[in-house]
């Protein structure tokens, strides 16, 4: 049985409610609650490797329980980390690097890259006359939100192709998930710039779209990170390591068996399953959403450890935006990676294969 567009709309509407309710699993009173800031308006499968450690037992092993908080936009997460309103948040260079260039980068630091480039694409309606990025001149490009990552990243890609993102195209905010696909389907926009899991939601709703071929020498920008206050490296180091290790383990779990990871996500947030769907159908919906994302959990660089940060990503993005940044040392650190990745990978893989919930 195929999931209908109505079912998927009901499911995406439930993501927000699920985030407010929180995962339906017992929380031990002695575990520290980690407030985790997410730069979107509702819970969605794109952060699956950051949250399923709760139900898989990885968080408990590190003596914490997670409380995700959807803060609406990535800049809001940045502010929340600085103010101490969240303990750990998702760091996005497109919002942090301009601050660093102006000498306004504050007390935060990126310490683990939980998803690597490149996860954005541009799609058009099937049969469109737009066949390449070069054909986008003079067109309306939709983005979910101007606070979303696809907006600054796609602007950078257009710049690399000598297309002026301010003069040569028009940008339109069309909403997250299925509404973005509907805008494309109805002709409100000529093309849609979005990220992998967002396209998965649109595909699951049965909306047709055609991916434009990616340009050659695509800039390796747009990785996303775990970010916390620098003071935590000293004052709460074990917590940062534990959260990073949970994300790393969850990433390995998903790579070993994506369906098992989808089941774990649905156990945490059963409200997100399409209404009236069977377990199999609900798992399929999550798998469609995360299918492209999972392979980006591993670094695309030779001999790099999972979660390690490559400074060249920041340098490339800074150059594309004309930012003068002489020193990136206060922006990120790899000092926790060896400890984070110190666990039995084969044990995690075996757990995924045996997962029968």
Where are these regions (language model features)?
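N-terminal export signals
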Residues: 7-26
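Short linear loop/turn motifs
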Residues: 67, 170-172, 279-288, 327-343
């Amino acid at each position: 049985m195929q999931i209908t567009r109505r079912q998927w709309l009901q499911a995406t509407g439930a993501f927000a409610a699920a985030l407010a309710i929180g995962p339906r699993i017992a929380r031990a009173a002695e575990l520290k609650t980690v407030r985790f800031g997410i730069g979107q308006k509702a819970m969605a499968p794109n952060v699956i490797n950051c949250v399923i450690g709760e139900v898989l037992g990885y968080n408990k092993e590190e003596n914490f329980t997670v409380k995700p908080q959807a803060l609406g936009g990535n800049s809001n997460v940045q502010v929340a980390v600085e103010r101490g309103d969240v303990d750990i948040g998702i760091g996005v260079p497109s919002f942090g690097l301009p601050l660093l260039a102006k000498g306004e980068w504050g007390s935060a630091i990126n310490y683990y890259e939980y998803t690597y480039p490149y996860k954005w694409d541009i799609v058009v309606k099937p049969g469109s006359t737009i066949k390449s990025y070069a054909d986008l001149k003079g067109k309306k490009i939709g983005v979910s939100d101007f606070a979303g990552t696809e907006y600054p990243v796609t602007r950078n890609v257009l710049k690399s192709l000598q297309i002026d993102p301010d003069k040569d195209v028009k940008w339109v905010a069309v909403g997250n998930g299925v509404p973005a696909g509907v805008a494309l389907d109805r002709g409100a926009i000529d093309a849609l710039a979005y990220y992998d899991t967002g396209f998965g939601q649109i595909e699951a709703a049965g909306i047709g779209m055609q991916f434009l071929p990616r340009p050659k020498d695509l800039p390796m920008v747009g990785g996303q990170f775990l970010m916390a206050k620098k003071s935590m490296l000293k004052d709460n180091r074990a917590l940062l390591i534990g959260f990073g290790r949970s994300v790393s383990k969850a990433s390995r779990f998903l790579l070993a068996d994506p369906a098992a990871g989808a089941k774990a996500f649905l156990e945490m947030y059963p409200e997100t399953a399409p209404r009236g769907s069977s377990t199999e159908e609900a798992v399929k919906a999550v798998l469609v959403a995360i299918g492209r994302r999972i392979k980006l959990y591993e670094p695309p660089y030779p001999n790099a450890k999972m979660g390690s940060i490559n400074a060249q990503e920041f340098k490339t993005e800074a150059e594309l935006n004309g930012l003068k940044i002489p020193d990136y040392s206060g922006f990120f650190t790899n000092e926790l990676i060896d400890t984070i990745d110190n666990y039995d990978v084969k044990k995690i893989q075996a757990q995924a294969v045996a997962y029968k919930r």
